[in-house]
Amino acid sequence: NNPFTFGSAEALTQLLVSLMPASDGANSIFADKAQALISGVMYALVDLRDKGLLKLSTSIIRDSLALEKCVALALHPELDEESRASIQAALGTSGWIAGREMKDQPPSFAEQFGYAQSYFGKALSSLTDTYRHIYGAEDGEVDFADAIMQRRILVVLLPSLEKAPAELASLGKISLSAIR
């Protein structure tokens, strides 16, 4: 089931933040920028999803985290002012200056953006490529709301012999978050 079909921008942001690798010391500033970036992107994407302009999935999120696409998303004409302000503020934490062409942005912008973007590379790659058949489905077969409301038994199998413990933990977090 695609956990990004439903849910608020904040809930989906927290789902992705929970998959970030731990950072400490000097790297915590980059982790903070990564959280700001994914928050801004999720507010914009959820806004477009709720307007029926796109079906949100892990591949859409991963594609939207490319520098040029993220800037284009910040300038999307269909965004609400709040969503636009959120993603533009997130880009601003990496040095983006609104109103300037990409070629006129500060040289450090692309570098700082890349650091923030890299925090989600592994998780989104895993969800989009390895588990596309599960999390990439636009309309999944499992209705988690029905399972909860009708008190049905739902079993999620994790490939414990085939994956590293950290990968299994990520899959478990995603499954639990999808149920919420």
Task: Name these PLM-found stretches.
Residues 1-180:
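P-loop NTPase motor domains
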